[in-house]
Amino acid sequence: VSWSRGLGDVYKRQAFILAVPSKGRLEEKSAEIFSKAGLPLLRDGARGYQGEMAGNGSVKVEYVSAGDIAARLAEGSAHMGITGEDLLREEIADFNSAIHLVSPLGFGQADVVVAIPDGWVDVTTMNDLADVAAEFRARHGRRLRVATKYAHLTTDFFARHGADDCELVQSFGATEGAPSSGAAEAIVDISSTGATLAANNLRIPNDGII
């Protein structure tokens, strides 16, 4: 759970806006959290995007995608929301000053990780990857490509490890398939168990958890 630090205008509005995930397990778990706290959420229809908190007319509930919740908190159009910390850190440049993390909820857990082909047997750390990137550019005349939906997190992490001689390729889904399709040499994506990465012959360097 997180909220925007810019709450000064809440009292000028009639409603406190709570943004929660609009579908799937995240929606179900979000509803369960509030229900257990004695604050059940009432959605306007199974597919509606508006709702309310039972017994509290000052709270307006809005059902949006997890990614959009981060953007809503950043712009101040939602005051509290349930979303992933990875999305918050990716979407909000001044994350530490703009957002207050209230509590981890224990569901939807996953890490943002660097993943490389299993065949790169000599690459076990990010320093190794930095060396490979330099060698790749010298040999092929172009930079090693990294497919990801997390451009900001990836840029910062790679720079901290001296592996910034890479080209980011924007991914719109199924990022784990980019190396096998030839769209990229490595990826940065979320992973909870590593099973999907393993199924695509990818692995995480020892220090590759962002």
Task: Identify the function of each model-found stretch.
Residues 9-210:
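Domain-level signature for soluble enzymes in the chorismate/prephenate branch of the shikimate pathway
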Residues 1-11:
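Single conserved hydrophobic/aromatic residue that forms the stacking wall/gate
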